[in-house]
Amino acid sequence: MEKIEKTLEEWRAMLDPEQFNVCRLSATERPFSGKYNATKTDGVYHCICCNEPLFDSKTKFDSGCGWPSFYAPIGDNAMTEIRDTSHGMIRTEVKCAKCDAHLGHVFPDGPPPTGLRYCINSVCLDLVPRE
């Protein structure tokens, strides 16, 4: 996979302010505010920054946490994981492997078959409905 690299100013020019703050500055959207939190549309969720496929809607579940949750990424190489010790917590941050956009965090409290919960900011995603 070829990495996409842009300056912060280039990202700022192509993203809206909330997308920029979350994807490029690692902010978090307010819980229950994202457009994909409750959607049930069948399709594939892509990175808003680079259009890389990230999650299949078949792995989405209602975790009640206020952000879209998935139990697995679309592929083993779709994202990278980074230890996050911000805000006095120890978590695992997930980023798009192609463009390094901050997506959210992964937690070990999800459903079978993986036991994982990828807690992802809606603003980082673009849902492409399945035809």
From Swiss-Prot:
Keyword list, A-Z: Metal-binding, Oxidoreductase, Zinc
Residues that bind Zn(2+): 47, 50, 96, 99
Enzyme Commission number(s) of this protein: 1.8.4.12
Catalytic activity: L-methionyl-[protein] + [thioredoxin]-disulfide + H2O = L-methionyl-(R)-S-oxide-[protein] + [thioredoxin]-dithiol
Entries under Pfam families matching the protein: SelR (PF01641)
Metal-binding in keyword set: yes
Any single GO BP term: response to oxidative stress
Disulfide bridge partners, by residue number: none
Cofactor(s) needed: Zn(2+)
Catalytic residues as annotated in Swiss-Prot or TrEMBL: 119 (nucleophile)
Cofactor binding summary note: Binds 1 zinc ion per subunit. The zinc ion is important for the structural integrity of the protein.
Superkingdom: Bacteria
GO cellular component, one term: cytoplasm
Domain MsrB residue range list: 8-130
InterPro entries registered for this protein in UniProt: Met_Sox_Rdtase_MsrB, Met_Sox_Rdtase_MsrB_dom, Mss4-like_sf
Annotated GO MF terms: peptide-methionine (R)-S-oxide reductase activity; zinc ion binding
Family: Belongs to the MsrB Met sulfoxide reductase family.
NCBIfam families: peptide-methionine (R)-S-oxide reductase MsrB
Protein name: Peptide methionine sulfoxide reductase MsrB
Lineage, broadest ranks: Bacteria, Pseudomonadati, Pseudomonadota, Gammaproteobacteria, Pseudomonadales
Gene: msrB
